[in-house]
Structures are given as structure tokens and as C-alpha cells.
């Protein structure tokens, strides 16, 4: 659904800030869903040697997000990004917001942006 807000989060099992960001969002995810209709897709950029670790990590974390694997990093290259975590908000096929890195509290700003772009 192109009109639905989508958060795309590029991450990897070896990226500590990535895991922290997805854990932080997980803590507030249900509250966010009560206020805003959005989808979160976490795209693992783990390569073919480590993608099994991504699946195991996701199963252990029980993240409610849709998880995709970008084993060849084609999607990451198409976005033109070299760094993770990379978080984007997309609506109607357009990137409305993009952020690289994670500091505790960044998820609050992400929620503000979701609220801003909701309408």
C-alpha cells in the first residue's frame, strides 16, 4: 500500500547500534501502532555467510516487524547508502525522511516524523 507510511530500517547482526535501535522501537511499537497506521520493515544486510544469524536473532528477539534479507546488498546499493543503521520513512514511493546512525532517544524523533507525515 503506497499510501501507508513505511519505516525501512537497514541493519545487520554485527551492528550494535542497529540492534539497539530496533530494540528501542520494539519497546514502543504497540503504542505507535495505536496512534499511527504504519508498517516497519527491517532489512538485514548480513551477507550469505551470516544471514542465518539474522534469522536466529530475529526469532530470539520476537520483533513484530516484517524482516527481509538483502544478502547481496542490492537494495542497500540501490539506496546509495554505505552506513547502517539507516532508517527511512517512505510514503507514496517517496523517501520523506532518512537518518543514519542511532543514539538513544532517536526513536522519539522518528515517532515525531511519523506523526508529521501521517496526513
PLM features per residue range, with description:
Residues 2-6, 38, 85:
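Alpha/beta-hydrolase fold active-site loops
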Residues 56-63, 71-115:
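Thiol/disulfide oxidoreductase modules built on the thioredoxin-like
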Residues 20-61, 72-77:
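Structural microenvironment flanking redox-active thiols in thiol-disulfide oxidoreductases
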Residues 3, 26, 31, 109-119:
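Proteins that catalyze or organize thiol-disulfide redox chemistry
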